[in-house]
């Protein structure tokens, strides 16, 4: 990124982001729906800082719902993840009863039939205030696919994470900056938000993600 003329001081910058009409964050950061990252403790901490935590799905349904309730008990924002397998419909039903701020269809490959099906199910069952996010994808075609399914937010990133092995094990992926650029350039609906998922090692990586089109 090349520095350019500016009339804005760092202290004047507004870091808030409006993901949907009902969901606004003070900082544009979500904690990952990974079992080593986000349960209620992390979700509470990041919500207090102005972001949003996504409770991971590697829990039985009752435990995941319990983690969501711990955050909601403090009147804080929280999201939760579901997968695309046959048992995930029950998980989605249970979580949606908790008035989530965001539900995330969290899969390694979001451009698939089963992902479309569970998005369609959630779309019918959720209330208007619950944001619907899905991923992960890395191409404009996949983004259009998720838009057709009816998501509010798209999660971009196949294999960029520091501990992710997708590119090594499956030989599949797109460099993260290219993925963001391609997805943002390939969709006409600017109201749909893009999350850059993975690959943030230094603070400067945030700037690059924003410049490429991430929200």
Tell me the role of every PLM-derived stretch.
Residues 1-29:
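An N-cap/entry alpha-helix motif that binds or orients negatively charged groups
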Residues 1-2, 15, 31, 53, ...:
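Generic structural hydrophobic/aromatic packing signal, biased to beta-strands
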Residues 28-31, 198:
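Short FAD-binding loop at a beta-strand-to-alpha-helix junction that anchors the flavin cofactor
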Residues 37-52, 57-215:
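Alpha/beta enzyme core
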